[in-house]
């Protein structure tokens, strides 16, 4: 630093300067010397850093990555522990969950030990190592990354967030194996996905926070509130998260502060607390300080300067008009993104806290303390341990008079029995946290227990609730008695019985295949499928040809040709269309039915049910939609074909006839050309009334003309009169459905079905020809054979033609895997298929066609045959020599174990003689004087509340689920939990598994029976008896004094329940005879303090510092409403939400006029609900539910006072903050206050406490005005 700048006093920091220390130096300089000189100092530090960084030339190379030599031995120790845990699991001593948790804990502890070893190795061998200096100075990287580089990567999480119990033993220097690389990619991907998802959540959280707090602006200097809050150091689990000094800096004192011993004045009321003053307060030994807070500020919908304190950016009292609500929202919301970004730095590596453990410093004997109660429990690793119910001391006495004591807090767990001998470094106990009411957040989860071997299920000491399928609280074991289990379809007949002994090659089961209909046999080329053909039909009078467009056609001998709709070797069903053809006209026209009956079908138009005639009156219709002046033809004009109809358009008629124009206003929308003969009759008007009808052949017309064929009499109105027109009619004969071909037995037939595509009297507008009706050939099958598939067969007839054949197929022998599980049978048995018929053989109905036999490839004894109706399978158990073990013994009478009876279970490792141990767990099936025979079995320990998937006696395959183990685990405190927890608190959500809370202060009494009962005895003789649910354990001890609202059991705390408890305590129970307003103030204050602490602990767990005042502003907005119970003489309605300050003023006004007061209760709203219930309906409508909010505001006739920033921005006003604050100054801030009181308040700003006592020069930037 420059000498002239510090000529009066030189300051020297004699320590290693890392990232944290540089931060502290800059903060100290800023507080003591102002921004200008701090900027100069930072410049100097930057130059100094670059100068020496250039000289040193520190870089990272592979040689800098030093792997501790102890790594191999640590990994070997962990492997040995895991092997021992696996042996306990195989013996049925611990459950699958306990094994899993133990393995996870072993690897995590190993990883942490190795991490410490990495640090120690760097310190002792190479303290100037580049990697070590970079990470520990805070320049680049962190300990977790260093650990992954030179230690071990550790445990990873799978895509569901579950920890994989296979850790990555390698580090990045050694390189990962293929398996480790795949597992590693899980965590890395999970990190990226979580970051993407949580970033959106964080942004939405910020939006909600801004919405609730945007109206909070510094509008007053001093609200003169007598209320405040007590600040203490924030602790969790006995660890200080935020010191009292850090919490005090920037706040304003509520009262004068005196030294507790000398009683001298330390600081005055309304004095802001600087760093130096905070030091003085801590030195004085004060543990708690009353300060002003936004939570207790009396300013209406705002905060005053004194209750807010410093603007943390400048280190001095906040100015009027500062939008502190927006700052608070951003301060809480912005680090939400950081809460998720942490995954990138660790790559999804799992981390967790290890419980504080006590190990033996020397060999000796353990002695439990006297007069202390212990409760035997089972740890989460399956070990027996003792839970300490009161604070106590554990004593270890060694040889030569060595003695040491260990302090145990209530809730600690002792791992060694009383008066047991221990060796050095043996684990003695795990210490519970000393923090009051400490509870680890837990969550219920499940894990599938799957069997490792196939065999028979046997329950041992297992009691199951039949209704829910759950194990009772005692637990028990499931044994799987080994054997080969065969899965057979229910179609198979087992030809053996229980107790049969079979040899290799014996038939276990068979299934026979019989023809249900009879017919000709057709074998496939691979002889794997047998098909019986009960019926077939060949169309003799038609052949298939391919036309010019490569479309197959069916051509009949009567020259009718149909378009084929099927292909060769395709499967058909009853009623399917085989071929079809259409009758097409030359132009559009009018259709009329004559003696026809038709029914409507979905797609095929109108199907003919009765034969008759179809009359067709042709006409050519051009849809032009043009102005009348553009039309070149006239109404009633006869025109030849090819005449141009529209000016400048190539629209010409294809047929000659008389023109009829259809007008709509000044437009011609249609030009109709009607072929026919024009009749010139003088009295056309009278004859036109007889028109629009059919004229039969031979009929006289006008007593002059004889009509030779069927005609239609029409007329056209022209400008000169009426023209009569004799139009041609085409008659089509239409037939009802008929069979055109059938087989000999009438099983199959082809029917011809005709359908008309238009309804009677319909006019079809067209220039081109249209498809008038169609003829379809449909395949019909007899009722008894409809469910069988029908296959097509094109039989070559000549070079370019085929004959068409239809075959009804009965498939007799489908693929084998339909009837048994080939994967299971592969190693146990083989399937043999026998076909008992020949190709083209005629078989009768009920004749045997083929059979499948299951042949054993092992020899052994059939012990069980059973059905599994749920899975539609039959299972068969075969015990072979592989499942039997013979143990030789010397003398039956000298056996140590007296429990050796037939049918008993024995576990591996048990001694039956001095030199003989049982090699495998199993069931005793034979005892002789020279040997014992065991059936190899596997025991599985089942915990309480597990859901059982099998029944005793069931047969199971290896890998099948036996039970669903239900257990509780501590919630991981990683990044994934951070943001949801903040959201849960700020949205004031009710927890799923909430703990039991004390309703009043008192002493506890515990009663243990089938359930745990807890009684609270208060000093005023109010007793409350609470019963805990099964599986829920108390967190308090006998005769422990507890406060109201304290948690008594495990689980999450419900904020709403705390609020209700304290309100009942302060007001409804009338303990202190408080007024309604005071009771609400006090009960809300408890909630506010709880929420501030909880939010801070989440952010502090991730190393993020947020000032209390920001959180307090948000929580003030959440707790500033009350719910009306009775409106009294006010206009308020029950359940209406209103601001607490507003109802207080209303009640105060009514009390002076002796009116009936409104009654109300406190309520806690989440940030979303608070935003929607704000006074400004413009702000609320712009947030969510716009229509509902605006409609409600309109109905209630609300007026928006435009006090916040958001509503002013929306309507285009100047915002009431910063420079725009003065525009609102007159009415909003100094209302009902005189000038004299303003001067008194502002004079405090110039008190000595606010002046800079450490600086000799005025700061050139901050104090230039």
Curated annotation (Swiss-Prot):
- Tell me, which GO biological process terms does this entry list? DNA-templated transcription
Catalytic activity entry? RNA(n) + a ribonucleoside 5'-triphosphate = RNA(n+1) + diphosphate
Gene Ontology molecular function: DNA binding; DNA-directed RNA polymerase activity; metal ion binding
Location of the protein in the cell: Plastid, Cyanelle
Q: Which UniProt keywords apply?
A: Cyanelle, DNA-directed RNA polymerase, Metal-binding, Nucleotidyltransferase, Plastid, Transcription, Transferase, Zinc
Q: Which residues bind Zn(2+)?
A: 223, 297, 304, 307
> InterPro entries under this entry?
DNA-dir_RpoC2_beta_pp, DNA-dir_RpoC_beta_prime, RNA_pol_Rpb1_3, RNA_pol_Rpb1_3_sf, RNA_pol_Rpb1_4, RNA_pol_Rpb1_5, Rpb1_funnel_sf
| Enzyme Commission no | 2.7.7.6
Cofactor descriptive note? Binds 1 Zn(2+) ion per subunit.
Q: What is its main location?
A: plastid
Q: Which family does it belong to?
A: Belongs to the RNA polymerase beta' chain family. RpoC2 subfamily.
Its biological purpose: DNA-dependent RNA polymerase catalyzes the transcription of DNA into RNA using the four ribonucleoside triphosphates as substrates.
NCBIfam families, A to Z: rpoC2_cyan
The entry describes its oligomerization and partners as: In plastids the minimal PEP RNA polymerase catalytic core is composed of four subunits: alpha, beta, beta', and beta''. When a (nuclear-encoded) sigma factor is associated with the core the holoenzyme is formed, which can initiate transcription.
Q: What is this protein called?
A: DNA-directed RNA polymerase subunit beta''
Species this protein is from: Cyanophora paradoxa
Q: Which gene encodes it?
A: rpoC2
